[in-house]
């Protein structure tokens, strides 16, 4: 499976400019060999929290329409990061994915809001865990958002249910880059799966984002990584490595869920 990871410099509070940028990246970099494209967290407006009432998408209307067009045009699955999204008069940080036929194949509201950013004052937390879902080729994957990375429990269910890739879409700060590397590697090792961390880069107010989008294999080895610059990472994944690792280290056969509280 060939995956392209878009490490974008999100334009703060301007969904139109961000859509234009994404469109240009597709036009310049897309080719028929790519199976999946991945975008970062909150790519429509960034963390312009105080103005999301006016700027957030409405029930994924514009964001889905935009991504659907790209998926159908380029015949590629898109793990479409996440966007600020108003639904039932509440604002969510909503991740979604669209297959190459233009179908919405996943939607997930960020469960864990970041207290350090006072997200709870502006956003509503999701009430459902991330689910496994199928890409066009039948591969089961799952999609989580940024701060979710610090909660290993959230990935356990989709991993045990057969997901072979975990996509963490993020706007992760430079000040915690060490945590980014360590936590992504841990999630890959403990679940015997590929983990792909897609981050943004540049500045959002006083916050510098770390970049360093990264792919880790089921053994915890580095497959590919960007630096802090805006760029695209393209990797080829051998998904047979997941089954091989799960046979070699059968953690899900050893797990004792009845003992855990």
Curated annotation (Swiss-Prot):
<protein>
    <recommendedName>
        <fullName>Hydrolase in agr operon</fullName>
        <ecNumber>3.5.-.-</ecNumber>
    </recommendedName>
</protein>
<dbReference type="InterPro" id="IPR036526">
    <property type="entry name" value="C-N_Hydrolase_sf"/>
</dbReference>
<dbReference type="Pfam" id="PF00795">
    <property type="entry name" value="CN_hydrolase"/>
</dbReference>
<feature type="active site" description="Proton donor">
    <location>
        <position position="110"/>
    </location>
</feature>
<feature type="active site" description="Nucleophile">
    <location>
        <position position="146"/>
    </location>
</feature>
<dbReference type="GO" id="GO:0016787">
    <property type="term" value="F:hydrolase activity"/>
</dbReference>
<feature type="domain" description="CN hydrolase">
    <location>
        <begin position="1"/>
        <end position="239"/>
    </location>
</feature>
<comment type="similarity">
    <text>Belongs to the carbon-nitrogen hydrolase superfamily. NIT1/NIT2 family.</text>
</comment>
<dbReference type="InterPro" id="IPR003010">
    <property type="entry name" value="C-N_Hydrolase"/>
</dbReference>
<keyword id="KW-0378">Hydrolase</keyword>
<feature type="active site" description="Proton acceptor">
    <location>
        <position position="41"/>
    </location>
</feature>
<dbReference type="InterPro" id="IPR001110">
    <property type="entry name" value="UPF0012_CS"/>
</dbReference>
